[in-house]
């Protein structure tokens, strides 16, 4: 005979254990033995997210919509190209979580400029042409895209882009990331080395000193001065920016530069950190390679056009929803 006295607390714990056991049985077998048990839970395990508007169901419903009919043909084309670039950044793991930014300039019917940027909260692999948010030079939203006011933009990040867009009317697209190899190069005193042919194709670089997270609009002037007329700006202790005449050019320039920083990192390791062990080509050879690759006849099209087009076809094979 059992002599142990069962208290209300022990009975409650026993019931809890039985309930958990039944739920485990359901998880393993698919047989729901808990049906009929009392529950106060209002959480739907299939749809729960920390905020309901950020749930898979809510976001997918938004991203199925298209608003491309509201824009000019030029803007639609730019939206599709920029959405493709976001998807490719995600595919290559060039982004840092949902951070970093790619922007593109579009001309309005009245001749003024607007800029496209990602909703702050979408994964790069979710971005569509219709989800891109249109802002003015100051980051004020002119068209929220299909996500409405759910996400908005990362205004701190736009400080960098707006500074360069203002200073460089020749630039259509700007891309920024913190890719580890590029960020690593930004942290060493000698900076970027033009070692292999890949680095010669990306062209000359310039630098901007670190002032913490770029949130101060007062820093915009020095950003504009530091990039000057170059297409690559290394943000010391931070990351990398490419700025170019098209989305394709900014994308392919980023591709080549990131590859070059990876080569430099491996070469430096192989050289045991001794600069004397590195073969660095002379400037004339570097300039020759750069000039050849930027000539239209080299590929038969403007820089970056064939490259972006090729990878848009890859995206079409994988998931063409970026075009929505």
Swiss-Prot record:
Gene3D superfamilies: Class II aldolase/adducin N-terminal domain. GO terms for biological process: actin cytoskeleton organization. SUPFAM superfamilies: AraD/HMP-PK domain-like. InterPro entries: Aldolase-II_Adducin_sf, Aldolase_II/adducin_N, Aldolase_II/adducin_N_sf. It holds the Pfam family Aldolase_II. It comes from the Eukaryota. Induction: By stress. One of its GO terms (molecular function) is actin filament binding. Belongs to the aldolase class II family. Adducin subfamily. One of its GO terms (cellular component) is cytoskeleton. This is Adducin-related protein C1289.14.
